[in-house]
Amino acid sequence: MKKQKRDLHQRAYVKGYRAGMAGRSKALSERCHTQARQDWLTGWREGREDMWNGLTPVDGTYKAASFSQ
């Protein structure tokens, strides 16, 4: 099994970050597990903050990729 599939919390965070950078609604978090949903929302908030601070989606993608390593 690949490492990225094992760590659900980190994966949820990165997906939330990317959704936030894309300007998507936080209502899109469809995580059933409470902690994974919280990680997604944390990533979403940081993604929105970075978007508001002027990071481009490309910069945000590099930042999100550094989280997953």
Swiss-Prot record:
<keyword id="KW-0810">Translation regulation</keyword>
<dbReference type="GO" id="GO:0006417">
    <property type="term" value="P:regulation of translation"/>
</dbReference>
<comment type="similarity">
    <text>Belongs to the ribosome modulation factor family.</text>
</comment>
<dbReference type="InterPro" id="IPR007040">
    <property type="entry name" value="Ribosome_modulation_factor"/>
</dbReference>
<dbReference type="GO" id="GO:0005737">
    <property type="term" value="C:cytoplasm"/>
</dbReference>
<dbReference type="Pfam" id="PF04957">
    <property type="entry name" value="RMF"/>
</dbReference>
<comment type="function">
    <text>During stationary phase, converts 70S ribosomes to an inactive dimeric form (100S ribosomes).</text>
</comment>
<dbReference type="InterPro" id="IPR023200">
    <property type="entry name" value="RMF_sf"/>
</dbReference>
<protein>
    <recommendedName>
        <fullName>Ribosome modulation factor</fullName>
    </recommendedName>
</protein>
<keyword id="KW-0963">Cytoplasm</keyword>
